[in-house]
Amino acid sequence: MATLRTHNLTKSYGGRTVVRGVSLDVASGEIVGLLGPNGAGKTTTFYMTVGLTSPDSGTVELDGLDVTDDPMYVRARKGIGYLPQEASIFRGLTVEQNLLAILETMGLDAATRRTRLRELLAELNLTPLAHAQAHTLSGGERRRAEITRALVVSPKFILLDEPFAGIDPIAVSDIQKIIFHLKERGIGVLITDHNVRETLRITDRAYIVHGGVIVKSGTPDSLTEDEEVRRIYLGAEFRLD
C-alpha cells in the first residue's frame, strides 16, 4: 500500500506563521479532505504537499522516502499527480492531442501510444470528445480531460485543488463519480475545496485546519457532529444531506 505523508510542516510569511506543525497522511485507495475556513492554512499545507511551496521545516514523504526537496515534476514522476483549480489543459489542442502530449514524453512506441490513448479516452468517457478543441469544453468536460491527462503517468496519488469550483451541479456529480473511480483504481486522493458539502460527501475522512493547525480529523459524520468543528467552520445548522 502506497502512502503520502507530511510530518510537522511549518510555514511563515513576513514573520507570521500560517502553518504550525501539520502532519497528515493519505493511503492508496483513500479519499481524504483537507478543509477549513479562509486563512486557516489549508491551502498553504496543500501547496507544500504538492511541491508548489517549500516548508520552513518538516517533511513530505512518499512511501517513506523524503520528497520535500523534489520539484513538482520529479514528484509527478514518482507518483504524485496534481490538478490545479485553474484550467491546466492546453486550450489550443484537442482532447486527444492533450493526452498525446504527455504520452509522447514516455518513450513508448507509436502503436503502444495509440493503444494507451484509446484506453485513456474510454476510461472516463472522453472518446466522443477526442477531437474537440479544449477551449470548447464545458467546465465539467475540462475537469474530466484534466483528470484523464493526470492518469497518463499512472500516479499513486492525485491532489485536487478546488475540483468543484466553477462547474454546475450535474458536473459536480460527474466529478464525484470520477473521484470514486480513482479510489476504485487504488489511487489515493487528497482534496481541498471550499465546497465543503460536496467534498465531505465523498471523503473517507478529512482534516480540519484552523489557525495553522489540524484541530480535528475523522469521518464526515464524526466531523459534522463535532461541536468545535461546527463552531469554527461548519456552523450550527450545517447538514450533509
Question: Language-model segments: what does each one mean?
Answer:
Residues 35-37:
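The feature captures the beta-strand-to-loop junction immediately N-terminal to the Walker
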Residues 66-81, 86, 110-114, 130, ...:
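ABC ATPase NBD coupling module
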Residues 100, 111-129, 176-180:
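Conserved ABC ATPase "signature" region
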Residues 133-137, 141:
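Conserved ABC ATPase signature
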Residues 154:
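Conserved catalytic motifs of ABC-family nucleotide-binding domains
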Residues 158-162:
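Catalytic Walker B motif of ABC-type/P-loop ATPase nucleotide-binding domains
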